């Protein structure tokens, strides 16, 4: 009977091992990172999984930011939400009002993991913090600011100094004309036109985008980006467009491809576009700060962040939340946050990641890689330049795109377009305000 005894023991051991194998907690993570950025997300997840065999982070690309947010909210309503959802910065107010989230600080507390919220760069963490408690609602991940990318080889050909990018919008208009005259198909193009030409233009030049400190002080805010300074700026771009010096190529990041394929000599785009530019550009390029308005009294002020943060969804079990907390803690560790910053161009979200990157000599070896960080820290933010917290902001951005396109096509004047955008946008703000009180 001994063989039977050994067989039974072996069977019991095998079943135990199978049980352990099946005990791995799967943690779905929906994101909007594609191309080189998606590869780095996968790399971080694989490394975490190797170090934490009881958990398995499963990253899934769910489309652009708007698509991912819509998919996440829809999945929550049917009880199929991921554990972690990446949401862009202007979706913050929507997520806060959704009743679909588990605040990050609660997740760490319940998991029994000590987590220092003060490690994050204040300009970044302030965007995603509860204005009442100061605690993080979501964890900063891929934060960015717009920067100016320029083709140094094209600058040389046009007789411009390749080490001196334009500092003001007035300079940029002059440079774009010279670059176009030198044979470039496109002197200047912009990605994310609403975010860069109105949201960040306003902050960088010390102007409010909306009342109530851009919505941080209440849901009864109204839009204010149809003032003379913003109208003048859009009018300048309109004139450049008529001359052929500014090319409108799309609402999102289309200008980055136009830049790295050599069509456009300059573009303003996300600092997170650096990964793809580094990969695909076949020419010498530089990274400069966003231009500012030469007539703005105290410009430049500070850039406001774009990008996204990681939200934890409600309705998961304790083991899932423990795994989520471990993964978020992993992402914030200096070596991992520094790697993400260095490989992608996104901001170092923690002070330690910035210090480590500097100590490693990365900025010396890669001039311009710290441009986005310097913009963000240029001056302490004013109450109305620390970001936007406006309800229905994704839909407001669509309205802004539509109205700016009416300028580029000659259907409306800049004043008419911005007035209409403000009027239409305020209707959405009132709808959101009403929903939060019901």
UniProtKB/Swiss-Prot annotation:
Residues 1-23 form the signal peptide. It holds the Pfam family SBP_bac_8. It is found in: Periplasm. PROSITE patterns: SBP_BACTERIAL_1. The keyword Signal applies. Sn-glycerol 3-phosphate binds at residues 65, 89, 144, 270, 307, 346, 397. InterPro entries: Bact_solute-bd_prot1 (IPR050490), SBP (IPR006059), SBP_1_CS (IPR006061). It comes from the Bacteria. GO terms for biological process: transmembrane transport. The keyword Transport applies. Keywords: Periplasm, Signal, Transport. GO terms for cellular component: outer membrane-bounded periplasmic space. Part of the ABC transporter complex UgpBAEC involved in sn-glycerol-3-phosphate (G3P) import. Binds G3P. The complex is composed of two ATP-binding proteins (UgpC), two transmembrane proteins (UgpA and UgpE) and a solute-binding protein (UgpB). Belongs to the bacterial solute-binding protein 1 family. NCBIfam families: PRK10974.1. This is sn-glycerol-3-phosphate-binding periplasmic protein UgpB. The lineage of its organism: Bacteria, Pseudomonadati, Pseudomonadota, Gammaproteobacteria, Enterobacterales.
């Amino acid at each position: 009977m001994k063989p039977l005894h050994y067989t039974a023991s072996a069977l019991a051991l095998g079943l135990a091992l199978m049980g352990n194998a099946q005990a791995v907690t799967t943690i779905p993570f929906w994101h909007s990172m594609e191309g080189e950025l998606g590869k780095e997300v996968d790399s971080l997840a694989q490394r975490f999984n190797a170090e934490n065999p009881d958990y398995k982070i499963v990253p899934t690309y769910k489309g652009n930011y708007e698509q991912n947010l819509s998919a996440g909210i829809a999945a929550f309503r049917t009880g199929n939400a991921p554990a972690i959802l990446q949401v862009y910065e202007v979706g913050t107010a929507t997520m806060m009002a959704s009743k679909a989230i588990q605040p990050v600080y609660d997740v760490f507390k319940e998991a029994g993991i000590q987590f220092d919220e003060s490690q994050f760069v204040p300009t970044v963490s302030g965007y995603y913090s509860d204005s009442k408690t100061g605690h993080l609602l979501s964890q900063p991940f891929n934060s960015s600011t717009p920067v100016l990318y320029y083709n140094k080889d094209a600058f040389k050909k046009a007789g411009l100094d390749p080490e001196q990018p334009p500092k003001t919008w007035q300079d940029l208009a002059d440079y774009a004309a010279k670059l176009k005259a030198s044979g470039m198909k496109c002197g200047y193009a912009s990605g994310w036109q609403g975010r860069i030409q109105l949201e960040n233009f306003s902050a960088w030049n010390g102007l409010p985008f909306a009342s109530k400190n851009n919505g941080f002080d209440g849901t009864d805010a109204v839009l204010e980006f149809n003032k003379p300074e913003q109208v003048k700026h859009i009018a300048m771009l309109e004139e450049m467009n008529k001359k052929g010096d500014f090319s409108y190529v799309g609402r999102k990041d289309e200008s980055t491809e136009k830049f790295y394929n050599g069509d456009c000599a300059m573009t303003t785009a996300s600092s997170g576009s650096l990964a793809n530019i580094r990969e695909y550009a076949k020419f010498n390029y530089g990274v400069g700060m966003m231009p500012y308005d030469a007539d703005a009294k105290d410009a430049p002020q500070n850039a406001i962040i774009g990008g996204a943060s990681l939200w934890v969804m409600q309705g998961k079990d304790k083991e899932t939340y423990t795994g989520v907390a471990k993964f978020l803690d992993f992402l914030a560790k200096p070596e991992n946050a520094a790697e993400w910053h260095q490989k992608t161009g996104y901001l170092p979200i923690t002070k330690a990641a910035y210090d480590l990157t500097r100590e490693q000599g990365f900025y010396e070896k890669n001039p311009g890689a710290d441009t986005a960080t310097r913009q963000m820290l240029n001056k302490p933010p004013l109450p109305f330049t620390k970001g936007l917290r406006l309800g229905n902001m994704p839909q407001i951005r669509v309205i802004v795109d539509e109205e700016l396109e009416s300028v580029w096509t000659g259907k409306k004047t800049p004043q008419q377009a911005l007035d209409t955008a403000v009027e239409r946008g305020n209707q959405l703000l009132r709808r959101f305000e009403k929903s939060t009180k019901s």
